[in-house]
Amino acid sequence: MTKFIFVTGGVVSSLGKGITSASLGALLEARGLAVTLVKLDPYINVDPGTMSPYQHGEVFVTGDGAETDLDLGHYERFVRMTMSRRNNYTTGRIYENVIAQERRGAYLGNTVQVIPHITDEIKRCICAGADNAQVVLVEIGGTVGDIESLPFLEAIRQMGVELGREQTLFMHLTLIPFIRSAGELKTKPTQHSVKELRSIGIQPDVLVCRLEHPLPESERRKIALFTSVPERAVISAVDVDSIYKIPLELYAQKLDEIVVEQLGLETGPANLTEWQRVIDGLEHPHDEVTITLVGKYVDHREAYKSLSEALIHGGIHTRTRVNITYLDSEEIEAQGIGGLESADAILIPGGFGERGVEGMIIAVQYARENGVPYLGICLGMQVAVIEFARHQAGMKEAHSTEFSEHTPDPVIALITEWRRADGSIERRDEQMGLGGTMRLGNYECELLPGSRAAALYGQERITERHRHRYEFNNDYRELLEGAGLVMAGTSFDGNLVEMVEISHHPWFVACQFHPEFTSTPRDGHPLFNSFIRAAAEHRRRVTLKSSRDS
């Protein structure tokens, strides 16, 4: 019988519901339970695929090609269960489903209303996301009291009534602010948040209180008294320097034990060996490197969430402290390469649109000419190909048709069709809406025997996740290979170039796919592990040269 844990938030947004849910999921998984998570987002967009990175942050792509909330990235980094499109639902998608059913006559002429039709669809989607797991953590986006969240809160209230206390648990996150001028913690916002939740008909079983300092026992008792939550279930969630410490912090307060007891789950003790190993790798580095990330959305770090975490994972698995410097590619265009000179390695991530592209090309040239390790991802591979074509293959006006429609040498162009692993053909054109023109999800890639890519992966066939519209133009393949660009990876049918590298460079690898989506703190990822090692080696070479010169 599947158990459901509903996670809500109050007082303010961005309290860390996703991280808390994922951390509790990790603890329950460590007890031997099959755990999955579902995110319910209250916005009306069908998915975040066409939303601005500045508003929404990263779009996390699942293996089945769904464009989802970045919290699903946290879920996959903390639990072993792979997420899919059934793990993220928005208000827009819920209403789209209901309206489609109404058009088909599924409601037999009844008036379609929020209750019961929308709430029933929400409950159906939650159960669909359960995917035979023993425990499902359901995170409700937004803040209690927001009008947008009301249908979701009503749906989980109904599930609590229908399934009963032995099958459901409600966990509420709140903020306990510290007023520095008074030197006091204030619990009143938490009391009012719980009051608001109870007015909807939901009594929380667990309170997770976000704060800067540990919660004094006197304040814990006060909160328990005014919210009717057991004192031991008032959890203190203190700020930590790494999100990967949170499972151990919650374990120390016996959150998993509280949950297991209420839900009547029979499990063994939590085995946290893997998480202890992660923390050991974080806290006892042997090296230190600075990675310069050259991007378009650097003012909003959430746009590169999986990428920054993947770099940290590489540091954990190579025992290297990773410092990430974010550099706006437009700044390179305006001020030159000064911001690159302290980099032990350079990374250019994905992105869309012409803005800042020339700055990225300058950064690629700097890395190639100065032997600085370079990793290009998605757009980062495309600008690497453009730079190589311009400066190594004599095509001075080479470009992508995304940025220069009439370039004489379109080394990157919109692909109109490709063959899937099942043999089917997928097609698209420039007239399709933005939501339907992407190559999304898992695709197989064949690696060139003897290439750096094959060596670092340790195999010649891999599966990685994609999110792009433009691709390497095969009309230029022979010419660029002749100039020294290695086509290190291709789609399984050989038609699409998925990876390129430069063999005579210390470490220059670029890929069309997004390896950051499959990197985890416990397992790392071969590309990022190798990239961090290369950065550390480059740092040692530069340090040795400087000492000799002095």
Swiss-Prot record:
This is CTP synthase. The active site is at 378 (nucleophile), 514, 516. It catalyses: UTP + L-glutamine + ATP + H2O = CTP + L-glutamate + ADP + phosphate + 2 H(+); L-glutamine + H2O = L-glutamate + NH4(+); UTP + NH4(+) + ATP = CTP + ADP + phosphate + 2 H(+). The keyword DNA damage does not apply. UTP binds at residues 13, 186-191, 222. Pfam families: CTP_synth_N, GATase. CTPSs have evolved a hybrid strategy for distinguishing between UTP and CTP. The overlapping regions of the product feedback inhibitory and substrate sites recognize a common feature in both compounds, the triphosphate moiety. To differentiate isosteric substrate and product pyrimidine rings, an additional pocket far from the expected kinase/ligase catalytic site, specifically recognizes the cytosine and ribose portions of the product inhibitor. One of its GO terms (cellular component) is cytosol. It is an enzyme of class 6 (ligase). GO terms for biological process: 'de novo' CTP biosynthetic process; pyrimidine nucleobase biosynthetic process. Mg(2+) binds at residues 71, 139.
